Structure formats: structure tokens, C-alpha cells
UniProtKB/Swiss-Prot annotation:
Main subcellular localisation: secreted
Keyword Nucleotide-binding among UniProt keywords: no
Phylogenetic classification of the source organism: Eukaryota, Metazoa, Chordata, Craniata, Vertebrata
Entry protein name: Interleukin-7
GO BP: any one term: organ growth
Provenance organism: Mus musculus
Function: Hematopoietic cytokine that plays an essential role in the development, expansion, and survival of naive and memory T-cells and B-cells thereby regulating the number of mature lymphocytes and maintaining lymphoid homeostasis. Mechanistically, exerts its biological effects through a receptor composed of IL7RA subunit and the cytokine receptor common subunit gamma/CSF2RG.
Subunit structure, interactors included: Interacts with IL7R and CSF2RG.
Keyword Oxidoreductase annotated: no
Disruption phenotype: Deletion mice appear healthy at birth and develop normally. Both sexes are fertile. However, they exhibit severe peripheral blood and tissue lymphoid abnormalities showing a strong dependence on IL7 for proper expansion of lymphoid lineages.
Length: 154
């Protein structure tokens, strides 16, 4: 008898707990029409893209960040939130004051627009050697994700 109740109590519930998502961040995109994106964020992303130069000498290998975090149909806002947090690491590059202003505009503006209520579960790892190739790819992915969101809302 004890064995049956043990299986009932401890057998099924752990399976349910395993199947539930570990963290559910509530993110709601505020401006789906894209006015704030087009008038502020897109301009700063383009400026940052110009400042970082060409990516012709960047390797084709995909960083772990992009393997773990993708802008798919259900997680656009969560991806943008993580990417915006990752951008803040590049303030340490100290390229120029203008670069830092645009970087903060994109990072803080994106976080404001995606409006995530829960805090991230762990700190973002330090980007190795302030990788300019990673920054260029991150900016491109942020821009692509915003464009995907805006096309889906039309």
C-alpha cells in the first residue's frame, strides 16, 4: 500500500514539474506599430553599425549566445531583452562618447519597449575581449528581430 501511494505522490508530480518551464518572463512589447523603433532605435543601430566597420574579417562560427537565444515566433521580446542586456557590456570598449550614447539608446530603449517584468535568472557572462564581430552580429540580430515583430503586427 505504501508503495502505491509513494508512486502516486512522487511519481507523477515530478514529471509535471519537469515539463513546466523553469522561468517564465512576462514580456509585452509596448510599441508594435514601430514608431519608437523607427524614430530612435533603428537610427542608433545604423549608427553603431557604421562605427563598428565591416565584418569581412569576422569568422563564420556562431557564438553560443545565438545558439541559446533566438528570435523565434514566441520569444521575440525575451530575445530582445537578453540582447539589450548583452549590449551594455560593450560600454567597456570606450570607442567614443557618441558610440556609448547610441549603445545606451539601443539597449535601454529596447528594454523599455519590450517591457519585461521578471528579472533574468543569472548575470550575463563577460564577452571575451569585447568582440567587435559579436557586437556587429548582435546588432544585426536585434534589427532583424524588430523587423520580424513589426511585419507580424501589420
Amino acid at each position: 500500500m505504501f508503495h502505491v501511494s509513494f508512486r502516486y505522490i512522487f511519481g507523477i508530480p515530478p514529471l509535471i514539474l519537469v515539463l513546466l518551464p523553469v522561468t517564465s518572463s512576462e514580456c509585452h512589447i509596448k510599441d508594435k506599430e514601430g514608431k519608437a523603433y523607427e524614430s530612435v532605435l533603428m537610427i542608433s543601430i545604423d549608427e553603431l553599425d557604421k562605427m563598428t566597420g565591416t565584418d569581412s574579417n569576422c569568422p563564420n562560427n556562431e557564438p553560443n549566445f545565438f545558439r541559446k537565444h533566438v528570435c523565434d515566433d514566441t520569444k521575440e521580446a525575451a530575445f530582445l531583452n537578453r540582447a539589450a542586456r548583452k549590449l551594455k557590456q560593450f560600454l567597456k570598449m570606450n570607442i567614443s562618447e557618441e558610440f556609448n550614447v547610441h549603445l545606451l539608446t539601443v539597449s535601454q530603449g529596447t528594454q523599455t519597449l519590450v517591457n519585461c517584468t521578471s528579472k533574468e535568472e543569472k548575470n550575463v557572462k563577460e564577452q571575451k575581449k569585447n568582440d567587435a564581430c559579436f557586437l556587429k552580429r548582435l546588432l544585426r540580430e536585434i534589427k532583424t528581430c524588430w523587423n520580424k515583430i513589426l511585419k507580424g503586427s501589420i
